[in-house]
Every structure is written in structure tokens, then in C-alpha cells.
Amino acid sequence: MFIKVKLPWDVTIPAEDMDTGLMLQRAIVIRLLEAFSKEKATKDLGYLITPTILENIGEGKIKEQTGEIQFPVVFNGICFKMFKGEIVHGVVHKVHKTGVFLKSGPYEIIYLSHMKMPGYEFIPGENPFFMNQYMSRIQIGARVRFVVLDTEWREAEKDFMALASIDGDNLGPF
């Protein structure tokens, strides 16, 4: 789910950038975009997608050690985070006999266990897949509608993993 958030952030402008004749607001926006792009995700907000509106620029404070100027800013941004029970679409990118891995938006690790695919059987081979009695296939590249069972934040990688299920109405490959 996409979430609109209001974020406080500290933007640091090197002293040499103040001499280039750039407008201050432009220099702050450029530094904000650079810092925002380096920050992948947070546990509370999910994946940081994009800043949208710069709402406020606070008073700058000079750092005595470096001479840089630090400005507190407040801006609106868009984040993406999956929640338990949410219905989401994803694309299969790995197939194993125990289940499949999907991608959806910035989520790269979504696991759909074979135990959460009722009626589907694993078909081994060069290009393995899962198939049900109606010949519906879950294979690499297949688009799947699933329900999120749970998510987990991975601090070291600064990303999320999710568990999925297609046990329910209107869920599965489409």
C-alpha cells in the first residue's frame, strides 16, 4: 500500500556549495534528493519511494568542525509498505519444489509456500512450475494475486521479506 507521509529530515550543505551562486532552496532540494535516494527503507514507513513537496526549511546551523550548514526540513513523501491481510499482485522470479519467490514493487523477497497453494502440484523439469487440475500454472514470469500473511523487517539489509498465500477466493495466477 502506498502511504503519504510527512517527514522531518536534516540536510547538510557543504560551505563550498554556498559559493557557487546556487539558490539556497535549490541546493537544499538537491541534497535532500541525494540523501533520500541513499535511504532505501525504514521499519516503520516501509520503502521510501519519492519526496513530493518541500513544506518547510528551518533555520540553518553551522557545524563548527566542518563549516557545513545543516538545515532541518519537513517534506511530504510517498512510501510503500505491505500489511498483513492486504491483497497484492506480484511476479514469480524463482520456482522451487517447496514454493515460489515473487517480486512486487520494491519487495524482492516474497515467499509463497507450496502449502499455501491448495490444489497445485510441483512439476519438475528444466523449467519447473506448479500446476492445478484446471491447468493453471505458476511459473517464472507468471503474475499472481496473493494475500500477505506476514512481513519481516531485515535491519542489516534495510529491506523487508513477506510471506504470501493464494488460499482464498480470487487469488492465484491471472
Swiss-Prot record:
KW Transcription (keyword) present: yes
Keywords per UniProt: DNA-directed RNA polymerase, Nucleus, Transcription
Matching CDD domains: RNAP_II_Rpb7_N
InterPro entries: NA-bd_OB-fold, RNA_pol_Rpb7-like_N_sf, Rpb7-like, Rpb7-like_N
Gene3D superfamilies registered for this protein in UniProt: Nucleic acid-binding proteins, RNA polymerase Rpb7-like, N-terminal domain
Places the protein is found: Nucleus
A GO biological process held by the record: DNA-templated transcription initiation
Pfam families assigned to the protein according to its UniProt record, in alphabetical order: SHS2_Rpb7-N
Function: DNA-dependent RNA polymerase catalyzes the transcription of DNA into RNA using the four ribonucleoside triphosphates as substrates. Component of RNA polymerase IV which mediates 24-nt short-interfering RNAs (siRNA) accumulation. Implicated in siRNA-directed heterochromatin formation through the action of DCL3 and AGO4, and subsequent DNA methylation-dependent silencing of targeted sequences. Essential component of a self-reinforcing loop coupling de novo DNA methylation to siRNA production.
Family note: Belongs to the eukaryotic RPB7/RPC8 RNA polymerase subunit family.
Protein name: DNA-directed RNA polymerase IV subunit 7
Organism: Arabidopsis thaliana (Mouse-ear cress)
